[in-house]
Regions:
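Ligand-binding pockets and gating/stacking loops
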Residues: 1-437
């Protein structure tokens, strides 16, 4: 068996180790593999000057409305204008400020929300828009940029020795993940929050002794390779599997089990994937996971937008889950140190199309921030009377991410070089929105 490894170099060996690890550990324990096998060591320049504002948030819950959330029917209503469509406004708990009738729970906690109504980008493509929102950078073929969770781990270090620092719930396969960072920054993906972290229990035929023997065999293969190639990225790749094994035996795995929650609490969040994902996010934050991202799909409403199973249903799912997440974190005194962000890749056209839907519209859309030192009870910026373009205080994705990074006390000016030697910052050239902090 010792001679096998010496004959397996490059991709053949990587495939073998990946197969062996999956057989031993279970597929779901492995993080996203984008960039894992090819990642090299990135370099950090000298420490940059501190931010102008010191953030107070310690953790991030990032809620992504996949498909392009309609701003005119959620957070940026235009009562009386012909573009408004069928959605009606309702009062919030802040005098004079209104939200959509489909968001009653969020209207009740509006004093904790800061709604940015002047978001804008240049792309109406889903994949490019999602990538830009999550990374602050345009998608290019020669570089993959990290999302916010891995950046947070980069600057703050590991906060939980057993659980991963970033967890992605219902995320698309094209998620940028750790980008050019090394494998130890890779997020852990959870497909279905109701099923938690799958494949963490060994099959009945696999005894503890057999498991240890399998792990020892893998370690033996790895040891020979590490001795032959004593490189930092080889060590990181090996450490990645060691951490996966540690996770399997950790008592903190119960954080992924929603059956620990009362049925009535699960009902409050909604029994759909997004509602249960937000509940799981709360549990993980309570276990000191630094970043949890939950994706809610179904917002690409090109037709029949006001049908009961389209906008009303989707907005209701989002409202119930996010509203109760805010309430629970506030009740547990965790909201002040937990930043919640809700965003999307672009808005939807103010003019309703001939299919009774709204099309892609990057010129104006909305994002929401709550907790983590955010000044609630306010709208920031505005779109024009038709909801077509930004009219005041335009905000680019990098500006939103700079505000998120500042709230989490990540250094905006610090430069990290990718393995290709290119310089990058957590929010690119974004400017943080000081009025929100």
């Amino acid at each position: 068996m010792r001679n096998i490894l010496s004959k397996l170099d490059g991709i053949n060996r990587r495939r073998f180790v990946e197969y062996a690890a999956k057989s031993t550990l279970g597929v779901s324990v492995l993080p996203l593999f984008n960039g894992v096998l090819s990642a090299a060591q990135e370099k950090v320049t000298a420490k940059a000057a501190p931010n102008a504002i010191k953030g107070k948030a310690k953790r991030l819950i990032y809620l992504f409305m996949n498909g392009g959330m309609t701003h005119l029917d959620t957070f940026d209503l235009k009562p009386g204008h012909e573009n408004q469509g069928q959605t009606k406004p309702i009062a919030t708990n802040v005098a004079g400020l209104q939200l959509s009738e489909f968001l009653p729970t969020l209207a009740g906690v509006f004093d904790k929300l800061a709604v940015v109504r002047s978001m804008n980008t240049q792309t109406g493509d889903h994949e490019a828009g999602e990538y830009l929102m999550r990374t602050s950078y345009d998608q290019i073929a020669t570089e993959r940029h990290p999302s916010l969770g891995p950046w947070l781990q980069k600057f703050k270090g590991r906060q939980n020795k057993s659980l991963p620092d970033t967890v992605l719930i219902s995320a698309p396969a094209r998620h940028p993940g750790a980008g050019f960072f090394d494998p130890t920054f890779s997020p852990l993906p959870i497909g279905d929050p109701n099923r938690g972290l799958e494949n963490t229990k060994p099959p009945e035929y696999l005894t503890a002794s057999s498991f240890d023997k399998r792990q020892a065999l893998i370690d033996g293969f790895d040891r020979k390779f590490r001795e032959r190639y004593p490189l930092q990225r080889v060590k990181q790749y090996s450490d990645f599997y060691t951490e996966a094994t540690s996770l399997l035996t950790s008592g903190e795995l119960k954080a992924f089990d929603l059956n620990e929650e009362k049925p009535e609490d699960r009902d409050r969040y909604g029994r759909d994937a997004f509602g249960q994902g937000c509940l799981l996010a709360r549990r993980l934050i309570e276990s000191n996971v630094q970043c949890v991202e939950v994706t809610c799909g179904g917002w690409d409403m090109h037709s029949s937008i006001y049908n009961g199973d389209t906008l009303p249903a989707r907005a209701g799912i989002m409202d119930k889950a996010m509203g109760n997440l805010i309430k629970d974190l506030a009740d547990r005194r965790l909201l002040d140190e937990t930043l919640i962000v809700l965003t999307t890749e672009f808005g939807r056209s103010p003019v309703i199309n001939y299919n009774a839907g709204r099309d892609h519209h990057p010129a104006a859309f909305s994002s929401v921030l709550a907790g983590g030192g955010i000044k609630g009870g306010q709208f920031y910026g505005k779109s024009d009377a038709a909801g077509h373009a930004v009219d005041e205080d335009g905000v680019a994705p990098a500006d939103l991410n700079a505000t998120i990074a500042t709230a989490l006390n990540m250094p905006l000016a610090e430069i990290v070089h990718s393995p290709t030697g290119r310089p990058f910052k957590v929010a690119h050239d974004g400017k943080m929105l000081s009025k929100l902090l």
